[in-house]
From Swiss-Prot:
Gene Ontology cellular component annotations, sorted alphabetically: cytosol
Keyword set includes Transcription: yes
InterPro entries: HTH-type_LysR_regulators, LysR_subst-bd, Tscrpt_reg_HTH_LysR, WH-like_DNA-bd_sf, WH_DNA-bd_sf
Start-end of DNA-binding region: 18-37
Ranges for domain HTH lysR-type: 1-58
PANTHER family xrefs: HTH-TYPE TRANSCRIPTIONAL REGULATOR YBHD (PTHR30419), LYSR FAMILY TRANSCRIPTIONAL REGULATOR (PTHR30419:SF30)
GO molecular function: DNA binding; DNA-binding transcription factor activity
Subunit structure of this chain's protein: Homotetramer. Dimer of dimers related by a twofold axis.
Protein name: HTH-type transcriptional regulator TsaR
Species assigned in the record: Comamonas testosteroni
Summary of the function given for this chain in its UniProt record: Regulates expression of the tsaMBCD1 operon and of tsaT in response to p-toluenesulfonate (TSA). Acts by binding directly to the promoter region. Binding to the tsa promoter depends on TSA concentration.
Protein family (similarity comment): Belongs to the LysR transcriptional regulatory family.
One Pfam family hit: HTH_1
Keyword match ATP-binding: no
């Protein structure tokens, strides 16, 4: 089983075509097909099936792909770690970040990291727990920065707390309940449920339950934090969002934070990674910069 063949299989799965994968890998299509055939012979199972739209993974291929990605990732990380320990600070870091930290500590952390390690390539993706779990497991992500509840985190993941996110209730500036001080005053309002580790609207639903109130009235579900401020600014909906998102969005002048005296659940932001898959020295350095700036801005 050759590493290059596993890389080729991953490429085929990503582009969905033998021809396109062969071009990207600078191989002839017959040579690529022969390599995949040899891998299938070794595994004694078909990995790919041809369709009208190209090629796709069989059930065997889907099962094997998780292992292929992990093998390729661990091989790359091992090479990068040895190189970094020898003083050659190159390589790649891929991680996911939730909106709260992406707007606050992350820009400063990335700038500091780039000054220290200018030759390390960083790839940042949007992502929240638990959606990021499969990519953490197969090694696609080195780590994730996301809100989570400690008891909900899978046991194969290591969770290192960064800070507690400050959550606020937000509505358009002229909202009738703009000056409300108690959750009970918001019972008749409609809500835009945003994504959360325990499902859309979990924060406000938990808050209502804590104070013995009925379920909040659902107006819509908005899983895009980028769209959420604009949706609320042009409607009568209320929503919850991290204070950093409320204070740093294009619709800030059209929004208000409801001055509640009742406490809201404030989720913890964690660094999540596989506990049995150590990060490279460069990734550890980036995490240290994130921790440093999170303490200042969280």
């Amino acid at each position: 089983m050759k590493l290059q063949t596993l890389q080729a299989l991953i490429c085929i799965e990503e582009v969905g075509s033998l021809r396109a994968a062969a071009q990207l890998l600078h191989l002839s299509q017959p040579a690529l097909s022969a390599a995949i055939q040899q891998l299938e012979d070794e595994l004694k199972a078909p990995l790919l099936v041809r369709t009208k739209r190209g090629v796709s993974l069989t059930s065997f291929g889907q099962a094997f792909m998780k292992h292929a990605r992990l093998i390729v990732t661990e091989s790359r990380r091992a090479q990068e770690e040895i190189g970094q320990l020898r003083g050659r600070w190159e390589g790649h870091i891929t991680f996911a970040a939730s909106p709260a930290i992406a707007l606050a500590a992350l820009p400063l952390a990335l700038a500091s990291f780039a000054r220290e390690f200018p030759d390390v390539t960083v790839n940042v993706r949007d992502g929240m727990y638990p959606a990021v779990s499969p990519q953490l497991r197969d090694g696609t992500l080195d780590f994730a920065l996301t809100a989570a509840h400690k008891h909900d985190i899978d046991t194969d993941l290591e969770a290192q707390p960064l800070y507690v996110s400050d959550v606020v209730i937000v509505g358009q500036r002229q909202h009738p309940m703009a000056n409300a001080t108690r959750l009970a005053e918001l019972q008749e309002c409609r809500w835009a449920f945003s994504s959360a580790p325990r499902g859309p609207g979990a924060i406000i639903r938990n808050a209502f339950a804590r104070y013995g109130l009925p379920e909040p009235k659902l107006g819509l579900v908005c899983e895009s934090f980028l769209a959420l401020p604009g949706v609320v600014a042009h409607s009568d909906l209320l929503t919850t969002m991290p204070r950093t998102l409320y204070e740093r969005n294009a619709f800030k002048d059209q929004l208000c934070s409801i001055p509640l005296q009742d406490a809201l659940p404030n989720p913890t932001i964690y660094v999540l990674r596989r506990h049995d898959l150590p990060v490279t020295p460069a990734a550890a350095g980036l995490i240290r910069w994130i921790q440093h700036h999170a303490l200042q801005t969280g």
